[in-house]
Design a protein with these regions (language model features):
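Terminal, compositionally biased segments used for targeting/anchoring and flexible tails
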Residues: 1-231
Length: 231
């Protein structure tokens, strides 16, 4: 089994949530907030809330869509916000631009709703990320499997979801390392196809482990070919 020159380093992560100074009582306010809030706020209400959504049974996976639905009573806008797939974004700037575009277009199409007061205000919050190296590295596929099975939900989310922003690539930490360091391109691609919206963190991890186990069995089979019986 291949040994990576650069081991995979698992990180543990925690998020500190801070309520900002901005809030929105209608769609015009929300647009101003989206244009002016910090990158940490956009991250909190999209990438970070997806982690919490994995433990819920209903509602949208980003806060802007959920507020548009539940508080502003604008179902069509909520669906347009929710249609923005965070897997398509490698920068907060690009995600912010599309959030603003969706809202501007909606306000232009339905100006009568732009200043209609919502049932409750939207409060812009920020997620401050604190990371520390986990006491576990992986140089082989076996060690990698052990690490993935061991890390917390927050760590799994950090490596599998939010890593796109850090790498500025449309992939995740796990797939990036498997392809680049172990040469397991097919495994990396299959892992990256795991849907972060239809799976919980637990089911996404379980699917990943099954894919890794299948790769390990394939390696064991190729390393121990059936020997012909002596005649």
């Amino acid at each position: 089994m291949n040994v990576a020159e650069t081991p995979f380093e698992f990180f543990t992560v925690a998020y500190l949530t801070r309520i900002g100074n901005q809030s929105a009582g209608n769609l015009e306010d929300l647009l101003a907030g989206l244009e002016q809030c910090s990158d940490a706020s956009i991250f909190h209400h999209t990438f970070q809330t997806l982690s919490s959504h994995h433990f819920l049974t209903e509602g949208f996976s980003n806060d802007f869509a959920q507020w548009a639905l539940a508080e502003a009573n604008r179902d069509a806008l909520a669906e347009q916000f929710a249609a923005l797939d965070i897997r398509d974004y490698t920068s907060i700037a690009a995600l912010r631009a599309d959030l603003c575009r969706v809202l501007r277009d909606f306000i232009a199409a339905f100006p009568q709703f732009s200043r209609q007061e919502a049932l409750d205000r939207f409060y812009f919050c920020e997620s401050l990320e604190v990371t520390m190296p986990f006491s576990l590295n992986a140089g082989t596929l076996d060690e990698f499997r052990n690490g993935v099975a061991t890390i917390s939900h927050a760590s799994f989310h950090f490596h599998f979801v939010t890593s796109r922003l850090r790498l500025q690539l449309r992939t995740n930490d796990f797939s990036h390392w498997l392809a680049g360091s172990l040469g397991l391109t097919t495994l990396a691609e299959n892992i990256d196809r795991i849907d972060i919206y239809t799976n919980t963190l637990d089911s996404a991890r379980a699917k990943m482990l099954r894919l890794v186990d299948r790769e390990r069995r394939k390696y064991e089979h190729d390393s121990n070919p059936r020997q012909d019986s002596a005649g």
